[in-house]
UniProtKB/Swiss-Prot annotation:
Cofactor, free-text remark: Binds 1 zinc ion.
Top-rank lineage group of the source organism: Bacteria
Pfam families: ATP-cone (PF03477), Zn_ribbon_NrdR (PF22811)
Protein name: Transcriptional repressor NrdR
Keywords carried by this UniProt record: ATP-binding, DNA-binding, Metal-binding, Nucleotide-binding, Repressor, Transcription, Transcription regulation, Zinc, Zinc-finger
Residue ranges of every copy of the ATP-cone domain listed in the record: 49-139
Job of this protein: Negatively regulates transcription of bacterial ribonucleotide reductase nrd genes and operons by binding to NrdR-boxes.
Organism listed in the record: Pseudomonas syringae pv. syringae (strain B728a)
Taxonomic lineage of the native organism: Bacteria, Pseudomonadati, Pseudomonadota, Gammaproteobacteria, Pseudomonadales
Length: 154
């Protein structure tokens, strides 16, 4: 680490603490050349993978686009903003956990479907009807029947 006072490369860490609810590390450092002390903050750079669209094109992950799609499905449904945000955090966590630099957009779509199914089944059906391009009532009926057959449903 360069000393901001004299530019020397030799510094030592005298104290480290977690701050910002564990999201940052605060370090007190001392320059071994001039003796000045200074503070640094470290945060992890958590980059989400790029998306590979069905046509093969690539684009950066867009959290706002994801949020808008989920909000559209959840419109006029009894789901709090907090639960929606928690679902978004869970999706982003799963994407980061892949360790991949690029993922197919289908992976994101399936993660959204999983989270919406947990939040609200009506929102799930709304999203699925667009995402899976339902063509007629039978496709809706089949998906609703599949939901009803899942374990834990009455």
């Amino acid at each position: 680490m360069h000393c901001p006072f004299c530019g020397a490369n030799d510094t030592k860490v005298i104290d480290s603490r977690l701050v910002a609810e564990g999201e940052q590390v605060r370090r007190r450092r001392e320059c071994l050349a001039c003796g000045e002390r200074f503070t640094t903050f470290e945060t992890a750079e958590l980059v989400l993978p790029r998306l590979i669209k069905q046509d093969g094109s690539r684009q950066p992950f867009d959290e706002e686009k994801l949020r808008a799609g989920m909000q559209r499905a959840l419109e006029k449904r009894p789901v709090s903003v907090e639960r929606l945000e928690a679902a978004l955090v869970h999706i982003k966590h799963k994407l980061r956990a892949t360790g991949e630099r690029e993922v197919k957009s289908l992976v994101v779509g399936e993660l959204v479907m999983t989270e919406l199914q947990k939040l609200d089944e009506v929102a799930y059906i709304r999203f699925a009807s667009v995402y899976r391009r339902f063509q007629d009532l039978n496709e809706f009926r089949e998906e609703i029947d599949r939901l009803a057959r899942e374990p834990g449903k009455e």
